[in-house]
Amino acid sequence: MKRILLVEDNVYFLQFLKETIQARLPSLDILEAKNVEEALLRMEAFSPDTIFTDLRLPGANGLELTQKIKAQYPETVVVIITNYDLPEYRQAAFQSGADHFVSKDSFLKMINSMSSDQQLEEDDSNPKGSP
């Protein structure tokens, strides 16, 4: 069973995201965190395969979280999802070690287009290093 960690400070969007993913991909084990500190604690206990993190978080941001995760768990896939789909943020995300960078709108469209038998890693529409 694949495990994912959702890191998002907006509780309404976090709940919506979790419910949307669970509806489309019910075989995933999903845990959530609302900030970087909570995410790091969940990492130790949960060992997710993939982390979806917002770019802007309270206290520290998704870039700092990505750096910490990749330093300790380099095999974990990190996907930054954000409303700030700007080239400078994309570049900073990849420099911090993110594997993917997608806008929240694109991410939701991707999830909604999946059927329950597809895996998240099958979508390579935004591979690391893409412009």
Annotated model-derived regions:
Residues 8:
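Conserved acidic carboxylate
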Residues 58, 86:
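The feature encodes the CheY-like receiver
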Residues 35, 61-64:
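Acidic catalytic/metal-coordinating carboxylates
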Residues 11-31:
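Two-component/phosphorelay signaling modules centered on CheY-like receiver
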Residues 54:
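Active-site residues of response regulator receiver
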Residues 63-74:
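Short amphipathic alpha-helix used as the core "switch/output" element in two-component signaling
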Residues 32-50:
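Acidic, metal-coordinating helix/loop segments flanking the phosphotransfer/catalytic sites
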